[in-house]
């Protein structure tokens, strides 16, 4: 989904997608091969290296502390679409499937998954899995948990992932069968995200409207929710009845530090042992601090400019192309991302295409949006469109340089080609509303958005431009595009699906439905006391904190 506060995708619905094989369980891992294990950060001159992982923990801990940039408004899994929620929730609530640190698919609460026909998924559950409040997981809990995602009254962030679901039924004490309205190659992949979370039916019903904001989440993960000091911190406690490997730390303290400088100072002073989503302006400071290590990993993330209104000036594709041609992408990577990224003309990351045949992967990245500025051509397009002097409004925020400096870059680009680009400042704690509230987007034509895939498949992002899609804020509608999305979704064969997705990528590029800017890796800082956290975006859904232990 969009990441909202840290604009990314993951919105209520961020269509995150992984390659899936609707007909054969064996294809699950093969279809979503992860990105390269190590190496440079992509094409071009990179100032960073990708690490496959951090060193494994050598021992256990009594506790460790983790800095997060915002307090989650709720930890209800049906609303978990942004970084703060998922960073914490992934350690408490588990899904039917599991996204591994290598960004591949593995069994989760479902020990076995089969697809006897293109419109059926059967999940055989692990036995003797305990909820945090003491109950034992059954098929009834799964049916109830997925049902909450499908209930329109709940306005679930993941509702779009269930649009092709006809029924979810109990087919045995520890077996659940999902019937689809039509083949959906993506559905099972999303069962590794918060869309596939299983919580106790009894626990949710007992909590009522307070579920997710106080008391137990009554899930099955290696940690259970401890204290929640509103506005300050959340503490997780190790769940000793966990069905899998026990967490290495007895406690985890998540500290809400909204100010970027305060967050970095906490990591350097030891107040926080580590954190994800490191402010880009602090990469160098942390790297040279001597108190720990800054790692970069595959983020399946692209930094884009989300076009939210096509009824005004930006309704003319020539104006969108002009802004794109005037953008200094390389300059933004140097300043906004501190050199840790690469300019791109693709809305999707290269790693999202890891499982595609080489020729299809090559085709997907040929002839896309130019990344080098062409001011003369951009000026001509603005003039042709009769848009000279017209106003375009872009949202900005101090939430991070990836937002503020990109907004400034858009303003500068507009000024160079005859557009009047105005900045509208949004408070960091209100930025998420751009993804959830149409009123918050009123008067805004564009905003910076870092989109991360929730599954290892480009359709996760490209499906956002289908008519009625959650993140289709501009209301783009193209029947031919919609038909291609449907065909790609239904394609069980990965080669066929990626071929269709390459066509979608070309259309999205030609129309500049969003303006692509850069690929951006995940960053994680660990001080010398701890190690074991994954370097990849997997931490959004994988119980990463359970792997963190003593470095000595």
Where are the regions that the model predicts?
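A bilobed periplasmic-binding-protein/Venus flytrap-type ligand-binding module shared by bacterial periplasmic
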Residues: 237-240, 299-322, 326, 335
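Surface-exposed binding/hinge segments that line
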Residues: 114, 122-124, 160-203, 227
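Ligand-site clamp/hinge motif
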Residues: 239-285
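Detector for C-terminal structural segments
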Residues: 28, 34, 229, 327-356, ...
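Append "and occasionally in soluble cytosolic enzymes with long acidic Gly/Pro-rich linkers
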Residues: 317-412
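N-terminal lobe/hinge region of extracytoplasmic solute-binding protein
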Residues: 4, 65-116, 147, 218-219
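Aromatic- and charge-enriched surface segment that lines or borders ligand/interaction sites
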Residues: 111-155, 177, 313-316
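Gly/Pro-rich hinge or "lid" segments in bacterial periplasmic/extracellular proteins
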Residues: 192-246, 251
